[in-house]
């Protein structure tokens, strides 16, 4: 499975591509950071991110895009910009029929390091080890994008099982409702 990991941001947006093999075997295929000037207009910054992400999607053809879910930070402007960048990325993927999944920072840290409170240095060290990279990915946005892709690769089987179980439960509930309504109608 090819997974594009994205650490969204307006100033720096980390992009990565990982391919999963048997078991927990992973191969890093590409990683980059899209940068936009902080003094540029918001629309221009989002357009630059969109153009870069669309190029990645059209070049690498991932099956899934894993994006970091934005949580409350102290700076509301930063949160809004990050969320807007994430929305542009999700839209670009959706337009191409590529599945999009969001993962929380603590979920990613736990998947990669075993500790949901790990710091950036620990995440970077584990990403380097897991992917057998020759050097640590820099800046942190690149390492975070790789960590997101790793997290999704390792969680994908669980996500698929949960979706299948939910679908079966919904189908059973619909059948039960149909049977109940038929019983009510027959009782009239």
From Swiss-Prot:
Q: Which residues of this UniProt protein bind Mg(2+) 2?
A: 68
- Comment on bound cofactor: Binds 2 Mg(2+) ion per subunit.
Q: Name one Pfam family in it.
A: RuvC
Catalysed reaction equations from the record: Endonucleolytic cleavage at a junction such as a reciprocal single-stranded crossover between two homologous DNA duplexes (Holliday junction)
What is the annotated localization of this protein?
Answer: Cytoplasm
Q: Its GO CC terms?
A: cytoplasm; Holliday junction resolvase complex
Q: Which residues bind Mg(2+) 1?
A: 7, 141
Which GO-annotated molecular functions does the record name?
A: crossover junction DNA endonuclease activity; DNA binding; magnesium ion binding
Under the heading SUPFAM superfamilies, the entry gives: Ribonuclease H-like
Q: Name one GO biological process term.
A: DNA repair
Quaternary structure note: Homodimer which binds Holliday junction (HJ) DNA. The HJ becomes 2-fold symmetrical on binding to RuvC with unstacked arms; it has a different conformation from HJ DNA in complex with RuvA. In the full resolvosome a probable DNA-RuvA(4)-RuvB(12)-RuvC(2) complex forms which resolves the HJ.
- Full protein name: Crossover junction endodeoxyribonuclease RuvC
């Amino acid at each position: 499975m090819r997974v594009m990991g994205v650490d969204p941001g307006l100033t720096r947006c980390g992009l990565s591509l990982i391919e999963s093999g048997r078991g927990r075997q992973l191969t890093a295929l590409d990683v980059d950071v899209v940068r936009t000037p902080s003094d540029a207009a918001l629309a221009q910054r989002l357009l630059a991110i969109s153009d870069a992400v669309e190029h990645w999607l059209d070049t690498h053809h991932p099956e899934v895009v894993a994006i970091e879910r934005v949580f409350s930070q102290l700076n509301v402007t930063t949160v809004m910009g990050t969320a807007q960048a994430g929305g542009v990325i999700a839209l670009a993927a959706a337009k191409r029929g590529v599945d999009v999944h969001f993962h929380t920072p603590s979920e990613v840290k736990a998947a990669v390091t075993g500790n949901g409170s790990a710091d950036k240095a620990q995440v970077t060290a584990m990403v380097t080890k897991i992917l057998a990279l020759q050097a640590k990915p820099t800046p942190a946005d690149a390492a975070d994008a790789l960590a997101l892709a790793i997290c999704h690769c390792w969680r994908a089987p669980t996500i698929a099982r949960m979706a299948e179980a939910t679908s079966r439960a919904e189908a059973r509930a619909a059948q039960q409702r149909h049977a109940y309504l038929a019983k009510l109608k027959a009782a009239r």
